[in-house]
A protein has these predicted regions:
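Long, contiguous, compositionally biased segments that the model treats as domain-scale units
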Residues: 1-104, 311
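Intrinsic-disorder/low-complexity coil detector
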Residues: 3, 16, 69, 114-117, ...
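A generic structural signal for short, non-catalytic loop/turn and secondary-structure boundary residues
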Residues: 6, 12, 21-23, 53, ...
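Short, charged N-terminal helix-start/capping segments
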Residues: 13, 17, 22-26, 116-134, ...
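Generic serine detector
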Residues: 14, 24, 44, 61, ...
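Basic/polar, acidic-poor N-terminal "presequence/leader" segments
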Residues: 75-147
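Amphipathic, oligomerization/interface secondary-structure segments
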Residues: 133-318
């Protein structure tokens, strides 16, 4: 998300925070951590160059540096990793800091579209010079862990560190995070697998959230689904949703979403759409609605519409 992993040598180790985002009672910083191998006087043994004259000049310069700074000891960087450092003025309980840490990982899970789980968590208490490790006891399904460990390609991410204002995004996210707990959980605990029951639940949840989004937009009751869809779904994503219902009836997309949601939620409704749709249809409809709700969030975080549409087109299943 931050930099292509295969090109990590392009980055210098920084002793200063790489970025800082700050609110009224919190501060979030991204910091480097690196490990080094001692190389000492053997540095010249691991350096090579096709230009022999340049290589010889390097050797001579290195010897001159050694003479000028006899106490200098060289080392080679082995690894470079990134950590978030979180501070809060008002939070005094460990659980509150853990919750804020999960908010950070939750946002990253949404932006990357895969579970992002805290690997290490340390606390530094006021007045202490030492860090204290925190052992997390949260349980995850093996499928979730496998997805979290799955490699991603920085260059193929439609939203990454370099093409958004990450400070602004974090500042807005900490204001909004509590309102999107149910959405965040679907990303953090994603398994990549759906039962029929889970597919039904996704449709009910995200259709209901579209209703709430419609209210924030000032939409009427008759447009409680179609108004958010028209606002946040790309033309391609909307077309994908429409394809499920065109083969069944001539009703509008909004009317069909309303009918399907009610058929799933109410036992007394006639199950016309439910009888016509397959489990694969249910899964995709639920995921498309989830992406539209996510796009509403991304828009509120200040991310440009063109990047949101690229995000939709990449994460939406065919």
């Amino acid at each position: 998300f931050i930099h292509p992993q295969g090109f990590i040598n392009q980055l210098k180790f920084s002793e200063q925070p790489i970025f800082t985002a700050e609110g009224s009672d919190w501060k979030l910083r991204l910091v480097n951590n690196a490990t080094f191998n001692a190389i000492g006087d053997n540095l010249s043994n691991i350096i090579n160059c096709q230009n022999k004259h340049a290589l010889e000049k390097f050797y001579v310069s290195l010897q001159e540096i050694k003479k000028s700074y006899p106490d200098a000891f060289f080392s080679i960087r082995k690894t470079l990793t990134f950590y978030y450092r979180l501070e809060s003025k008002n939070q005094t309980k460990i659980n509150d800091f853990i919750s804020m840490s999960w908010n950070v990982s939750g946002l990253l899970s949404i932006l990357i579209d895969k579970p992002v789980l805290p690997e290490e968590l340390y606390f530094k208490f006021e007045g202490s010079d030492f860090r204290t490790p925190c052992l997390l006891s949260t349980r995850f399904e093996q499928r979730t862990i496998d997805l979290a460990l799955k490699q991603i390609n920085h260059r193929f991410l439609p939203i990454n560190w370099k093409n958004i204002n990450i400070k602004e995004v974090f500042c807005k996210w900490f204001e909004l995070a509590d309102r999107y707990v149910s959405l965040t959980a679907t990303y953090q605990y994603e398994t990549g697998f759906r039962t029929l029951h889970e597919a039904h639940a996704d449709i009910i949840l995200f259709a209901t959230q579209l209703e709430a989004i419609n209210l924030t937009m000032g939409g009427s009751k008759n447009e409680k689904y179609i108004k958010p869809i028209n606002e946040y779904a790309s033309p391609l994503l909307k077309q994908k949703l429409e394809q499920f219902f065109i083969k069944i009836n001539s009703e509008s997309l909004g009317a069909n979403i309303a009918t399907l949601r009610n058929e799933l939620a109410h036992v007394d409704r006639n199950k016309k759409l439910m009888k016509a749709l397959t489990i694969g249809d249910y899964i995709k409809i639920g995921m498309y609605l989830k992406i539209i709700v996510t796009s509403h969030l991304l828009s509120n975080l200040g991310i440009d519409k063109d990047k949101i549409e690229k995000y939709q087109n990449q994460v939406a299943p065919e």
